[in-house]
Amino acid sequence: MKTSVFIAIFNLLVCALAYTDLTGSIKINDKKITLGEFNTQEVKQLTINSPKDIIEIDLKSKDIKGKPEQIMVSLADVKNPAISTHYVPVVKESKIKLNIKALSIPEVLKTKDKLVLTIVIADSKSKNNMIRRLVEVLPSPEFKSTSRYQAKPRIGIQPEIHHIFREDERTVNPIVPVVFIIAAFTLLLGLFGSWVGFIGIDNLFRTFKTISKVQLLHNVSFLISVLGFELNFVKYYLGQSIFTTLFYGFILSIPCVYFGVSVLRSLAKNRALGK
């Protein structure tokens, strides 16, 4: 597609020679420039401020006697002429007219800093052919902001990808430690209740006189171990790490099992003796 456009433009360039008597005006809103018969190097400028603007081209050439074989108006980027769009004006006798709505300009051209409007006239039966830069069109920042153009990514170095991995949860749902705390307190109360049920409230404190000091130490150590478990779960509920909680739980389980077995054996022995 691009190749065919370049070939057509090249053919027009080969044919284009003169048409120096081109006169008329180009207007955008209330701003207007005029073209004289002399083709000077100076190219005037007009500004597009809104998508509602219209580029009005009204030209006249004495050498044109009807529509030429080839006539085209192009709007292209000054820095990169390959980015362009083309229009066919209306030719009636020696008059050339064309209205270009700013809204119809390609999105990519709306983003450019400076555009150039050029007319090409060529006819194989005439020696007076022409290529002429008519005016430079400057898209305003407000007009640029209306463009929906997005540049396509090119092959090459791409921006570095940054990804923040989500950290593991430091604690579980608060309801879990609450359930463990309630269960631990329930078991502790059940332990005391079983002692009262088996031994009786009157004989509970009397057993301190019948058991040895070593067994009393084991009983107290067992109670301290159970309270340690309670404290460990409370600290976990207040924000202690799960790994720290498991570590302390493992440490407390050793004396708890050891002294718990001793307490149960002592209770079984005393019950067998009827104490």
Curated annotation (Swiss-Prot):
It is found in: Endoplasmic reticulum membrane. Keywords: Endoplasmic reticulum, Membrane, Signal, Transmembrane, Transmembrane helix, Virulence. Its main location: endoplasmic reticulum. GO terms for cellular component: oligosaccharyltransferase complex. The keyword Metal-binding does not apply. Disruption phenotype: Leads to sensitivity to both cell wall-damaging agents calcofluor white and Congo red, as well as to thermosensitivity. Causes significantly more damage to the host macrophages. Residues 1-18 form the signal peptide. The chain crosses the membrane at residues 179-199, 214-234, 241-261. It is a multi-pass membrane protein. Pathway: Protein modification; protein glycosylation. InterPro entries: Ribophorin_II_C, Swp1. Induction: Expression is down-regulated during biofilm formation. It holds the Pfam family Ribophorin_II_C. GO terms for biological process: protein glycosylation. Component of the oligosaccharyltransferase (OST) complex. Subunit of the oligosaccharyl transferase (OST) complex that catalyzes the initial transfer of a defined glycan (Glc(3)Man(9)GlcNAc(2) in eukaryotes) from the lipid carrier dolichol-pyrophosphate to an asparagine residue within an Asn-X-Ser/Thr consensus motif in nascent polypeptide chains, the first step in protein N-glycosylation. N-glycosylation occurs cotranslationally and the complex associates with the Sec61 complex at the channel-forming translocon complex that mediates protein translocation across the endoplasmic reticulum (ER). All subunits are required for a maximal enzyme activity. PANTHER family: DOLICHYL-DIPHOSPHOOLIGOSACCHARIDE--PROTEIN GLYCOSYLTRANSFERASE SUBUNIT 2, RIBOPHORIN II. Belongs to the SWP1 family. This is Dolichyl-diphosphooligosaccharide--protein glycosyltransferase subunit delta. It comes from Candida albicans (strain SC5314 / ATCC MYA-2876).
